[in-house]
Amino acid sequence: MNAYEANFDGLVGPTHNYGGLAVGNIASAESALTNSNPREAALQGLEKMKRLADLGLMQGVLPPQERPAVSVLRKLGFTGEDATIIRCAAKVAPGLLRACSSASSMWVANAATVSPSADTEDGKVHLTAANLPSQFHRSIEAPVTSAVLKRVFSNERYFVHHDPLPSNLYFGDEGAANHMRLCPRHGEPGVEIFVFGRSASRDIPKPLRFPARQSLEASEAVARLHQIKRGKELFVQQGPAAIDAGAFHNDVLAVANCDVLFYHEAAYRDWEETEARITKACDWPIHFIRTGEEDVTLAEAVRTYLFNAQLLTLPGNEMMILAPSECRDSHSARNFLERVVQDAANPIAHVEYVDLRQSMKNGGGPACLRLRVVLTEPELDAVQENSRVILDECLYNDLKAWIEKHYRECLSPTDLGDPALLQESRAALDELTTILGFGSLYDFQRP
């Protein structure tokens, strides 16, 4: 059966700002409390989506969450009208307001883990929204993430939704950013690789500088929930030194597509053992495209997000890399990519660069912005039954006009305390749900 790998990208929200919230995210820390440009950020993300759609790839769109999250501030003791709550939080707890205003839901690689129907015992697509307990500003996303995914993938004949795991560090789950899949072709059964940084129950090496986010126990639970076919799941440990260098998720240093694993050798605790285990689990040859310190240092790989590129199969079965423009500007990263595409021994034939500087300054590259979902033709038809989330020229034009209408060009840290920003954001999201055919999605839209 024909199948497509659809990339569902998160739209950048109107409150995109540099709050410096993410522990272990070096770019986020370096950009903390500087001015952002939400309009530019959203347009950059949309242009990336448009480029992939123009290449003939299946490209979807997921909406941002409502921010500032006034309902969360109420749970934390702030009272009064919405405007009063925002002003008070800005005065007495500005860090809390920044967290509740974060547009981090744009990085939908952390939204969920998705297993395609070819990999599961019941032949259905399984989705588990990530609980993200390691960072407060992300831990509040799971309920709306679940609602969005259930709206988009609503047909119970094809899709199974699991609740987020219990929200604690024992089951810390960061979604698809720590999950990869290898397969002969997208529609065929594959091997799912779950990458963890720590274990709550086993004594394993740990990073020293930054905390590991994904637990082995969470990865094992998601694999069980998804009913992955026996022997077709692997659990691999991140390199502790990589986490300390700023690779807070596996997708900062590795990306897989079909029969290719493109990665930095520091990504895993033992890269040789990892390759051996993958080779044993797969019934088809795997192209391991690996680099190390001699070609691209770990620090440069993290700075440029070289391996947070998207690795894509084009119509015609050639592969291409969509890398952040920071890689083009880096001598070592650019040279490595040029050598990869010139090597006829691997399927990667092209590289393109994309400007995502607004997202990159917050520590999110091309792969952070997308959730990969392999869909058969009937599954894709089911997605399009009740919503308008697959990008075409008309939807692109509508979204571009929507962004230009509603988004500010500059947002400073103090602007987060402006109650007008909440009203602007709600007006934007209210219109967006109409554009996407969602109906009422957000709390403010309900009586």
Swiss-Prot record:
Catalyzes the hydrolysis of N(2)-succinylarginine into N(2)-succinylornithine, ammonia and CO(2). NCBIfam families: arg_catab_astB (TIGR03241), PRK13281.1 (NF009789). The gene is astB. This is N-succinylarginine dihydrolase. Substrate binds at residues 19-28, 110, 137-138, 213, 251, 362. Its EC number is 3.5.3.23. Pfam families: AstB. It comes from Nitrosospira multiformis (strain ATCC 25196 / NCIMB 11849 / C 71). It comes from the Bacteria. Belongs to the succinylarginine dihydrolase family. It is an enzyme of class 3 (hydrolase). One of its GO terms (molecular function) is N-succinylarginine dihydrolase activity. The active site is at residues 174, 249, 368. Homodimer.
